[in-house]
């Protein structure tokens, strides 16, 4: 897909500029290592994370949009959990999965955790893929074009996603795999396509919430998805901001969601879709609530202001 600027790039650049102004008594130096690939995308030099480090004692604040929070406790990737004083994560983190992961990983000497995660963890808000096209997004939200009465998904159909929908064969449920030829679209075309349909299906990926969720919120297309357990300060409420089709999604063991039964998930998905698809008043209700949540939390400036209100550099001493 194409766009002007990646959201993560814009957010981190603006964050750096604001930090320099707010803390003019300090000197901020950007450290980038082109060899970050040896650590991988979840390593300390990943473009998906931003660390504020005290060079004297190496204490740090971590802000991450990487799609697997477990990597941030792995020593071979360069992280030191005991020196992590604040951990800001947007994609999906809850304490049940964290403590389960910690317990089942007791014998893994590569892992290092903070002394008290409840004092360290902070949420901030997930985002659309690109920082662009806000006029077009608003135009799409306000458009009243007739919709196709279908539930729609376009994305990477990894094996764990295929298991979620294998065997579903209905004309009113459309699933397009971007791994297939000619199934990847430029960004605006992608948003316009979502807007054509009654409901956007969100199949979780490497982390609980997806760019697709936020993009669908932004253009006013109701999202059907499994329950979100994210600890946002402004909570995403099931059946108010999005339509919940399944009660639980476990991320404690791998970077992929686990369900009690894929067959059970499919039954609940179809049941929920059939229940809501003719209820225009309810779908409009979800659409408005989700759009309001997006505007309040997910635009660059609002998300940045929220982050800056929570970052505490005194903890780095």
Which positions does each model-derived feature cover?
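Nucleotide-sugar donor-binding catalytic core of glycosyltransferases
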Residues: 1-212, 218-219, 224-238, 248
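Catalytic binding pocket for nucleotide-activated donors in carbohydrate/polymer assembly enzymes
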Residues: 189-315
